[in-house]
């Protein structure tokens, strides 16, 4: 079985992306990272078969809605979760919106939407 893989897009701040990455990798998900809108689009073109995208609504280089539309132009059915430190955002084109500071909510949502068949097996 193959573990699900996510593209995580965020600012290049200490701890911001590493926390999400650590949470996802601890749950046995694979993670690819991007630190700007341009890098996100280029990375998604290179790896269009990721299981989903987790992005910060204030990613550098563009506004949230524009980036979501650009990513969906590459693959229209991609699962897209937006996180924000301001709570619910105006990025309504995303599939789901979560608070930046609630990694448990992100993990619970991903476990529900994209179950990892290896998570239980690998944790034994």
Placement of each model-derived feature along the sequence:
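Phosphate-coordination loops involved in phosphoryl transfer and adenosine-cofactor binding
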Residues: 2-3
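Conserved sequence signature across two-component system core domains
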Residues: 9-11, 34, 53
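Short beta-strand elements of ligand-binding domains
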Residues: 10, 56, 79-85
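Two-component/phosphorelay signaling modules centered on CheY-like receiver
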Residues: 13-32
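Conserved phosphotransfer microenvironments
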Residues: 37, 50-75
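Short alpha-helical segment
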Residues: 39-42
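Output/docking surface of receiver
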Residues: 83-124
């Amino acid at each position: 079985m193959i573990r699900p893989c996510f593209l995580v897009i965020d600012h290049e701040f200490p701890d911001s992306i590493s926390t999400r990455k650590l949470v996802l990798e601890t749950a046995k998900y694979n993670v690819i990272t991007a630190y700007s809108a341009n890098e996100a689009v280029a990375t998604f073109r290179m790896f269009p078969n990721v299981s989903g995208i987790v992005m910060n609504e204030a990613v550098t280089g563009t506004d949230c809605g524009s980036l979501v539309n650009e990513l969906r132009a590459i693959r229209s059915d991609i699962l897209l979760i937006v996180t924000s430190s301001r709570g619910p955002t105006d990025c309504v084109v995303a599939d789901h919106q979560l608070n930046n500071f609630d990694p448990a909510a992100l993990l619970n949502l991903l476990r529900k939407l994209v179950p990892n068949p290896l998570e239980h097996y690998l944790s034994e």
